[in-house]
C-alpha cells in the first residue's frame, strides 16, 4: 500500500469514528519550553528561542482539533487536466470568497480572457491563506495549505491526507519538510508550529497531530532551503533561519543566532516569503511598502531586481516567480479595482493577479487578470521544488 493510500485510509477511518486526535508529544529542547498535557498552549513567551509542546498519550484522543467541515469534504474537486505539471506558467491562488484553491494556466492567456477562462484545477479547502505544491518523498505529490483548516491534499486527486482546525491562531503560511513533517506560521499565535505529520508513515494518526510551538512575532512566511539546509521564517520585523534537529516524528527546530536579519527601516510587516526560482542565492519578501529581494550570501535586502520597475508595487500580499523567469503577484489590496464594501475583502484580498512574462513579439509584458467573484490573498507559482 502506498503512503498516500495508507494516509487516506487512516484519516477516513478516524473521521468515521469521530476520533481525530489532538496533541502529541516530543520533549522540547532543554531550556526552550514546557510540555502541556492534552490542551492547546495558552501562553507564549516572546523570547525567540522558546518552544512549547502539546502532548497526549499514544492511543488517546481529543476533539480539540476539529474534523473537516462538511462543506469542504462534500464539495467537488474540479480537474480539467489531471497532469498539468509539464506546463510551465501555472499559478496557484486561494480564493477566500469561494473557500477553494485554484490553479490557473497562464499559458492559455489571450487578449480578452479572464482568470475564470484560465482555470485548470481546484479543490475546496475552507478559509486558507498559505499554499504550496510539493513533490515529497513521504507523501508524494501534494498541495499543503494553512488556514482555518490546514491540510495536506493529494495531487491531483484532491483527497485530504491529513488536516487540523486551528483558526484562532490565524495561520498564514505552510511548509512541508523533506521529512514529511509540517510547519505552519501563524500571525496571531506568533508561532511556528511544527506538526509530527511524518508519523503517518508509521500509521500513527494521533502522533501526527502532535505539535511544538516556536515563538516568532507575527509569523507570516516559512520556506525550506535544501541548499543551506535551513528553514527560513518571516515575521513582522525580521527574517530568521532555523536548522532541523532530530529525525522523523522527533524532529525539532533550532534557531540560528547568526542568521537573524532585521527588515530595512520603514519596510516592516512581512507578508510573503518565496524563493527566486532562477537563482538559489535569493529570496523574495513582500512587505506593506514594497517587494524586497534578500541576498542569502550577504544578508542584504534590496528593492532592485529583474523588472522591478514594473513589478515592485505597494500592498502586494503574494509574489512569486517560476524557473522560466515569469512572475506572478496578487493585485494591490485596499479595494483597488473592486466594488467590495466588506472591509476584510478590501483590506487584505484582491480580485486580480498580475502575470508578467516575456512575449516574443512585445518583450517583457505585465497583464492584470481579474475574477470579479474572487478574493485572493497569497498566490504561488505551481512548482514542486523548494527553490
Predicted regions and their residues:
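Short loop/turn segments immediately following beta-strands, especially the blade-tip
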Residues: 105-111, 196-204, 243-251, 295-303
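A short beta-strand motif characteristic of beta-propeller blades
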Residues: 113-124, 159-165, 206-214, 254-264, ...
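Blade-loop segments of beta-propeller domains
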Residues: 115-151, 156-175
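Short coil/turn segments that connect the beta-strands within blades of beta-propeller domains
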Residues: 87-89, 139-141, 179-181, 227-229, ...
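Bacterial lipoprotein signal-peptidase II cleavage site
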Residues: 23-32
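Repeated scaffold domains used in trafficking and secretory/extracellular systems
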Residues: 126-137, 168-177, 216-223, 265-276, ...
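Conserved beta-strand positions in repeat-built beta-propeller and related beta-rich domains
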Residues: 92-97, 142-148, 184-188, 231-237, ...
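C-terminal motif of bacterial Sec signal peptides marking the signal peptidase cleavage site
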Residues: 18-21
Amino acid at each position: 500500500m502506498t503512503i498516500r493510500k495508507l494516509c487516506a485510509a487512516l484519516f477516513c477511518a478516524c473521521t468515521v469514528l469521530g476520533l481525530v486526535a489532538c496533541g502529541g508529544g516530543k520533549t522540547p529542547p532543554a531550556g526552550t519550553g514546557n510540555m502541556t498535557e492534552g490542551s492547546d498552549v495558552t501562553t507564549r513567551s516572546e523570547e525567540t528561542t522558546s518552544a512549547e509542546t502539546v502532548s497526549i498519550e499514544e492511543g488517546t484522543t481529543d476533539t480539540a482539533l476539529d474534523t473537516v467541515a462538511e462543506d469542504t469534504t462534500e464539495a467537488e474537486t474540479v480537474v480539467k487536466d489531471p497532469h498539468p505539471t509539464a506546463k510551465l506558467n501555472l499559478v496557484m491562488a486561494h480564493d477566500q470568497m469561494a473557500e477553494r484553491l485554484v490553479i490557473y494556466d497562464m499559458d492559455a492567456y489571450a487578449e480578452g480572457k479572464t482568470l475564470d477562462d484560465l482555470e485548470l484545477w481546484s479543490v475546496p479547502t475552507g478559509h486558507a491563506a498559505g499554499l504550496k505544491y510539493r513533490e515529497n518523498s513521504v507523501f508524494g505529490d501534494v498541495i499543503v495549505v494553512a488556514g482555518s483548516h490546514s491540510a495536506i491534499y493529494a495531487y491531483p486527486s484532491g483527497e485530504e491526507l491529513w488536516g487540523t482546525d486551528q483558526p484562532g491562531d490565524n495561520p498564514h503560511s505552510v511548509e512541508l519538510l523533506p521529512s514529511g513533517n509540517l510547519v505552519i506560521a501563524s500571525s496571531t499565535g506568533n508561532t511556528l508550529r511544527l506538526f509530527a505529520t511524518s508519523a503517518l508513515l508509521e500509521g500513527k494518526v494521533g502522533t501526527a497531530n502532535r505539535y511544538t510551538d516556536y515563538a516568532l512575532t507575527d509569523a507570516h512566511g516559512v520556506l525550506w532551503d535544501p541548499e543551506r539546509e535551513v528553514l527560513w521564517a518571516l515575521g513582522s520585523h525580521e527574517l530568521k533561519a532555523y536548522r532541523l534537529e532530530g529525525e522523523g516524528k522527533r524532529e525539532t527546530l533550532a534557531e540560528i543566532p547568526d542568521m537573524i536579519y532585521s527588515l530595512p527601516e520603514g519596510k516592516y510587516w512581512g507578508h510573503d516569503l518565496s524563493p527566486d526560482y532562477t537563482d538559489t542565492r535569493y529570496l523574495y519578501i513582500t512587505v506593506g511598502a514594497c517587494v524586497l529581494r534578500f541576498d542569502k550570501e550577504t544578508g542584504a535586502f534590496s528593492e532592485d531586481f529583474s523588472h522591478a520597475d514594473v513589478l515592485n508595487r505597494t500592498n502586494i500580499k503574494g509574489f512569486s516567480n517560476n524557473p522560466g523567469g515569469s512572475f506572478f503577484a496578487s493585485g494591490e489590496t485596499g479595494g483597488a479595482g473592486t466594488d467590495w464594501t466588506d472591509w476584510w475583502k478590501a483590506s487584505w484580498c484582491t480580485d486580480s493577479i498580475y502575470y508578467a512574462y516575456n512575449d516574443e513579439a512585445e518583450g517583457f509584458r505585465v497583464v492584470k487578470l481579474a475574477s470579479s467573484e474572487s478574493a485572493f490573498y497569497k498566490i504561488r507559482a505551481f512548482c514542486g521544488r523548494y527553490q
